[in-house]
Amino acid sequence: MTRNTGTRNTWARNTWTLSADHVDLRRPVRKPRPVEIGALPQRLTLDLARTALVAVDLQNDFCHPDGWLASIGVDVSGAAAPIAALASALPGLRAAGVPVVWLNWGNRPDRADLPPGVRHVYDPDGASTGIGDPLPGGSRVLELGSWSAGLVDELVPEPGDLHVAKHRMSGFPGTVLDAVLRNLRVDTLLFAGVNTDQCVYATLVDAANLGYDVVLVEDLCGTTSPGFCTDATLYNVRQCFGFTTTSADLRAGLDTQEP
């Protein structure tokens, strides 16, 4: 009798095949699934078999009118802007076999792993409502397992989706994100989420520096920052790190894939 080491794993892509007296170290071979999409600065051909979507920080504290940002007077409409487009794009990506990774802030209740520089961003004067502090509704800002750190209701994870908690602007330092992506055997990352110019960008840059191909999906990202911040981010992504596309271009490519 043989058994694959990934039989309990929805995304069993980095596995061995085992029997009582033999171990086959060959990984499963997936047929390439190329699709061509419009992008900048050049058109792209993606291999869907080696692509994942990373959706960043689409959480109540950033996007919901009862969340942390709104409670301190920030207009969250910019952060909420990509939610409907992402909800519309997800079924096609999942049907194409693209893994969805939800990458969200999720801090320890004791904040023991947060250096002063990170805490200062969210509480610059030491007297404001910052990470881990209670909100009027009782939830604590970006605390793992809280309503505040939860995904917005409009985005419904499916059982095969993956979840990674982060505690920096980038999703890589001190997290399992790189290990998860390596085990998925993916090379190309599509980026969605908020804020375009902050956590999405920081994670994208780290991903590029780790050797991943990075593609920012413009209308699946949003921000509460001034417009010039998005302009600068898109320029830098195209100039220094990777590519940008839109959900319409992505959908057009998915529609042409072979069954």
Where are these regions (language model features)?
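Active-site-adjacent betaalpha module
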Residues: 1-52, 61, 92-96, 113, ...
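A short alpha/beta connector and helix-capping loop motif
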Residues: 49, 67-93, 98-104
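Short, well-ordered beta-to-alpha junction loops that form the rim of enzyme active sites
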Residues: 103-106, 194
